[in-house]
Every structure is written in C-alpha cells, then in structure tokens.
Amino acid sequence: MTTRAQSAALTCTAVLLWGCAPVGTRYLVGDSQVGLPAVPFIGLRYGLAALCFAPLLVWGKVWRWPRADLALVALCALFGVTGYNLPNAIGARTVGAGMVGLLNGVEPLLIALMMALRQRRIPGAGTLVAGLVGLAGIALLALGAGPAMGSARGIALILFGAFAWSLYCVIVPPLLYRRGAVLVSAMTMTLGSLPMLAVGAPGIPHLALQMTTLQWEIMLSMVLGTSVLAILCWNIGSAGLGAEQAGWFLYLLPLVSVAGGAIFLHEPLTLMELSGGGLIMLSVFFSQRWRTT
C-alpha cells in the first residue's frame, strides 16, 4: 500500500519530468530548418514507450478484463495519451517550451471544474472567478507571444491537449482502483500510442536515419523518463491522492518548463507573457482556495 507521502513524492516526480518534456520536444521539433517532423517524432517516441510496457500486458493478462474496463481504458488512452501528446508535439513547432508549460498550467482548474460537473454540483462563485482569471491569462499569453514563441494555431493545440489530459485525470481513477496503476499505465500507453504510431509510420524510417546521436539520446531519455516513468509515477500517486489533490502538483509544470526553456533554449519572455502566466497560476490558486474553504 502506497502511503500519502509516497503518493505525493511520486506525483511530484511525474510533474517534474513532464515539465522537462516541452523543452526536449521543442529542441527536437522546433520550427528551425533542423527541426524533426513532429508527427513521425511523436509516433516513434510513443511506439518505443509502448514496447517498454508490452511485457506487462502479457504478465497482467489484460485480455481477460471485462468489456466495460477495456472500453474505459481505451477512452482513457485516447484522451490521456493520444489526445494530449499529439497536439502538444505539433504545437511545439510554433510554441516555445516555456509557453507550453504556462498554457498547461490551466490543467488543475480544468480538473476542478470537470470534477464538479461529474459530481453534479454547481461550481461556486470562487470557481467562476478563477475561470475568468484563467481565461484572461490565456488571452494575455496569446497577445504577448511573438510569431516564434506562440502562433494562434499552436496555442489552440496546446490548450486542446490540456483539456484532453484533464479529462483523463477525471475519468481514470475508478479504473486505477480496480485494475492497479501499473497495468492501467501499460494499457493506456500502449493503446494511446497506436494512433500516433499509425499516423507517423510513413515518416519514421526516414526520421530514424536522419537523427543524430544527440537527438537519439534526448529521444530515448524522453521515452524512459517523460513517457514511461512519468505515467507510472502519476497513476500510482494520483490513485493515492485523488484527481483534485494530485492536480495541486501541476503548479510545478509551468515553472520547470519556463526555467528549462530560458536556460537551455534561450527563450525570451515578455512582461505580457509573464503576466498571463501569473494570472493562470492565480486562477489555479483561487480554485484550490475555494475548494478548501
């Protein structure tokens, strides 16, 4: 049995790893001439991640799961793996790593709102205020971003991914309790990787041949760290904490991404972008403050 402290540590580890993902993705698929094609890249990355989980599927005899659980895990895979990662990879070509992290900072608020809808309770005034503040922050980010730091299309893709991930966080807990975090991680990663592998397959052979040693090293570190280890840590941790409490730790994601983008990619940040990110963080604080009062 995982203690609450262990669950918190695992959840924190997952978010720190995910905070590094936009930096690695932006470095590999950025819109420069040497940037790798985004769709084959994400297909290869998650195809390799699925291979890492394949032995667990055999060990867990997942084909014996009831149809209801198989349908739910397929839905979780669609939202949490495909729906989050494919838009993020494409959006990363025109959105800086720090901007990606700031946009993903809206996820805790989305989780809180979705949980309210699922529990059929009306969000309070505090949640509505938090939502308006968050929307204002997103608007500032969009207005403050230059063409190289955040195109409108790229921002929309990142926000769609944030919505898909938040939905995953809300619908997956019952499955985690019934089937265990390890097997659910294996199933969601494998099933969610298949669509990305399928759409990226035509370009993967050429991509694999053109990648340098450094690019392969970054790719494999992302496969093992931000894809395999992170989803395991998140699912185990969130099973112990619950979706809303685990959402607290998503505060860290924008901080890691912004710092990584500035340090490793030399990404500039305007005052308007920082203000927008601050409003998003403030909206998340309001949503959590309302929840605990």
Residue ranges of predicted features:
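Transmembrane alpha-helices of multi-pass small-molecule transport proteins
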Residues: 33-83, 110-114, 133, 164-171, ...
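Specific transmembrane alpha-helical segments of multi-pass solute transporters/efflux pumps
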Residues: 17, 21-22, 54-104, 140-142, ...
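Hydrophobic transmembrane alpha-helices of multi-pass small-molecule transport proteins
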Residues: 53, 74, 114, 123-144, ...
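Glycine-/small-residue-enriched transmembrane alpha-helix faces in small-molecule transporters
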Residues: 1-40, 147-174, 195-198
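Hydrophobic/aromatic residues within transmembrane alpha-helices
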Residues: 28, 41, 45, 91, ...
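Membrane-interface helix termini and inter-helical loops of multi-pass transporters
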Residues: 23-35, 90-93, 142-152, 200-219, ...
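Helix-helix packing/entry segments at the starts of transmembrane helices
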Residues: 11, 15, 44, 81, ...
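Loop-to-transmembrane alpha-helix entry segments
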Residues: 67-69, 101-104, 117-140, 151-155, ...
